[in-house]
């Protein structure tokens, strides 16, 4: 497996130096050659050659981006443009640091599979998870302009991320105003979720925090088709939950047992089953309005 380096664009298959997107977005004028490159790239995606950006079954890596957001979801043309412009798709191992705090970055990542978190830590090693990203989320669009992050980006379990160089994001934004708006919207949605996380830590008690987080994750995963019948996979450990909710592992264990005994929720073997959605939402004071789902 190629070592992941978020500080530079990843280039395998059709990368930034030889891909379709360069001919269309970066000012080259040999349109005949561009057409041949595009056709060749389309052929390879169709037969799913390893190293290109289509998923098995012909699904696009960006297919979940803004899914569930109604009219804000990308058109097929916009989605195809975004798909053709990705630098690379990277498979990453569990607990792999994808971006280190303070290090220069020149690319951003869209989660394709799995879960990725952003975390901050003290010098003594205490860790706080400050966000959790699911398939369809851009993890670090703020790095597009800031050029470094004030937190680490870490995969929770095995995951796949689609890498976009910042040059490509700039070209896409210039070429397609709707894509520029979608990147902005993605950042606004992140900010809304961050505010909800601040509220959760600042005003909710332990059981309420756990209930609120599980309600949020269920709602977000349901929007992208990854939660069915109030059940979903979640590779978080009790230690991870503690890092996200500022609770000890012992406290998390106690709360999960209480929720299970009250018939609200079961979390075991990395699977979540919500038995009473209405009661769990009431316990966590959960209002999904901040997720801006399609109505």
Predicted segments — roles?
Residues 6, 30-32, 39:
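Short hydrophobic alpha-helical segments enriched in small aliphatic residues
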Residues 131-196:
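Cyclic-nucleotide recognition modules
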Residues 42-94, 138-139, 144-146:
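Cyclic nucleotide-binding regulatory module and flanking cytosolic helices
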Residues 3, 15-19, 27:
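Short glycine-rich, low-complexity segments
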Residues 96-158:
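Cyclic nucleotide-binding regulatory domains
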Residues 178-246:
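Polybasic "coupling" helices that flank or enter modular domains
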């Amino acid at each position: 497996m190629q070592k992941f380096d978020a500080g530079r664009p990843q280039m395998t298959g059709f990368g930034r130096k030889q891909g379709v997107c360069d001919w269309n977005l970066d000012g080259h004028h040999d349109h005949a050659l561009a057409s041949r490159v595009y056709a060749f790239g389309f052929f390879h995606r169709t037969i799913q050659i390893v190293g290109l950006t289509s998923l098995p079954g012909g699904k696009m890596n960006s297919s979940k981006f803004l899914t569930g957001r109604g009219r804000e979801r990308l058109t097929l043309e916009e989605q195809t443009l975004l798909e053709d412009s990705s630098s690379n798709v990277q498979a990453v191992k569990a607990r792999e640091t994808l971006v280190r705090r303070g290090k220069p970055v020149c690319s951003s990542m869209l989660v394709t599979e799995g879960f990725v978190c952003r975390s901050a830590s003290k010098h003594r090693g205490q860790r706080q998870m400050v966000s959790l990203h699911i398939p369809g989320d851009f993890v670090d669009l703020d790095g597009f302009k800031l050029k470094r992050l004030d937190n680490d980006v870490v995969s929770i379990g095995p995951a796949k991320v689609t890498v976009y160089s910042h040059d490509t994001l700039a070209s896409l934004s210039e070429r397609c105003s709707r894509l520029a708006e979608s990147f902005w919207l993605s950042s606004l949605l992140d900010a809304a979720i961050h505010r909800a996380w601040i509220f959760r830590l600042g005003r909710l008690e332990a059981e309420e925090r756990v209930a609120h987080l599980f309600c949020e994750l269920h709602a977000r995963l349901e929007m992208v088709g990854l939660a069915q019948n109030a059940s979903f996979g979640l590779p978080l450990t009790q230690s991870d939950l503690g890092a996200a909710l500022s609770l000890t592992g012992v406290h998390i264990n106690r709360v999960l047992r209480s929720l299970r005994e009250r018939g609200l929720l079961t979390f075991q073997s990395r699977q979540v089953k919500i038995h009473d959605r209405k009661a769990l939402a009431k316990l966590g004071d959960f209002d999904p309005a901040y997720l801006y789902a399609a109505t």
